[in-house]
Amino acid sequence: MHQQKRQPELVEGNLPVFVFPTELIFYADDQSTHKQVLTLYNPYEFALKFKVLCTTPNKYVVVDAAGAVKPQCCVDIVIRHRDVRSCHYGVIDKFRLQVSEQSQRKALGRKEVIATLLPSAKEQQKEEEEKRIKEHLTESVFFEQSCQPENRAVSSGPSLLTVFLGVVCIAALMLPTLGDMESLVPLYLHLSVNQKLVAAYILGLITMAILRT
């Protein structure tokens, strides 16, 4: 007797929920960003019901805050910010998407999406750039501090090889260029333009290395 294949029972709250994006940023000076779209994906072989909850529902309008997603399909959820005021700048709100099977009420999974209102996209880019610079400086200071004791133990200044290479590069740049017929320097000491460019590049690297010591 052929038995019907049963779907395994799903544990409440453990089902992964796939939403994109996971962060919404609204800019007060850009009205086109006042409407954002969340995409909910259903990669499973059964249909899902969904519901959108919010920590501050008075600030947002959610189009189709509840509905269903067919198996292996997706649905777009439109979210509009309707209270764009300076007092809300930087405040983090949260949306929660709960999903369940169509035949049941218990939530199988949930996913939180944060939403933030910022005054301007340009200010946001500036803050991110300043943050990157600050992180870079912090990393470089840490690197120098960790290497200073070893550097002091090895030498207190540039090595003799570095100084010698620097002198050679300076001398190479002072030599005449190929084609300079009025020079008193022997022809075999005339350097090409490419050779002088290489010498200048190496001299620049040496100068940077000396300045860091």
From Swiss-Prot:
Q: Where in the cell is it found?
A: Endoplasmic reticulum membrane; Golgi apparatus membrane
| Residue spans crossing the bilayer | 159-179, 191-211
Which parts of the sequence form the motif Nuclear export signal?
205-208
- Give Gene Ontology CC terms: cytoplasm; endoplasmic reticulum membrane; Golgi membrane; nucleus; perinuclear region of cytoplasm
Q: Which GO terms describe its biological process?
A: cell differentiation; negative regulation of transcription by RNA polymerase II; positive regulation of transcription by RNA polymerase II
- MSP domain segment(s): 16-143
* Tissue expression per record: Widely expressed. Shows highest expression in ribs, and slightly lower levels of expression in heart, kidney, muscle, thymus, calvariae and lung. Also detected at low levels in spleen and liver.
Q: Which InterPro entries match?
A: Ig-like_fold (IPR013783), MOSPD1/3 (IPR039283), MSP_dom (IPR000535), PapD-like_sf (IPR008962)
Keyword vocabulary terms for this entry: Differentiation, Endoplasmic reticulum, Golgi apparatus, Membrane, Transmembrane, Transmembrane helix
Q: Which residues form a coiled coil?
A: none
For whether the record's keyword set contains Cell inner membrane, the answer is no
Membrane-related topology note: Multi-pass membrane protein
Q: Name one Pfam family in it.
A: Motile_Sperm
Keyword Membrane among record annotations: yes
Q: What induces it?
A: May be up-regulated in response to cell-cell contact.
Q: What does this protein do?
A: Plays a role in differentiation and/or proliferation of mesenchymal stem cells. Proposed to be involved in epithelial-to-mesenchymal transition (EMT). However, another study suggests that it is not required for EMT or stem cell self-renewal and acts during later stages of differentiation.
Protein name in the entry: Motile sperm domain-containing protein 1
> Can you name the source organism?
Mus musculus (Mouse)
Q: What is the lineage of its organism?
A: Eukaryota, Metazoa, Chordata, Craniata, Vertebrata
